Amino acid sequence: MKSRLILAAITTIGLVAATGETVATEKISLRVTPNVSNAPSNVIVKATVPKHADNRWLLVEADSGAFYRSSAIQLDGENAPLVTEFRFNNLPSGEYTVAAVLRNNLGQETTVRRTVLVLSRFGEP
């Protein structure tokens, strides 16, 4: 009986934690292609932001530490497109963190990140 209660408690905690994460990622999702490519690489970033009156800004950035590129657009709340596409052309080799930051009308931010590997012609980042 005691083990069932412990199992139920762990399951409940896990579901609450998972639900919290799901809510956060529903505000914005990110698809980056290709995940691995050769330099110079053209990377396409598709940010999906559900329409909401509070959405104001979307910033997407690619950062390898040695190279940085970003782009931002203003969102028109419920009239903004569901999917916004960004292109980062001719990225040099490196391991990039691609991040999308959604800012609402109160200045609160939601961030999602992906990793992209751009290899040199010798097969190294």
Where are these regions (language model features)?
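Aromatic sugar-binding surface patches on proteins
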Residues: 78-85
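Aromatic/hydrophobic beta-strand junction motif of beta-rich domains
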Residues: 45-51
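Short, compositionally biased P/S/T/A/G/V-rich stretches that sit at domain boundaries
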Residues: 20-43, 123-125
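Surface-exposed, short loops/turns at beta-strand junctions within beta-sandwich domains
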Residues: 88-94
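Short beta-strand edge segments in extracellular beta-sheet folds
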Residues: 76, 115-123
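Short acidic/polar inter-strand loop motif in beta-rich domains
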Residues: 102-113
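A short tyrosine-centered beta-strand micro-motif
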Residues: 94-101
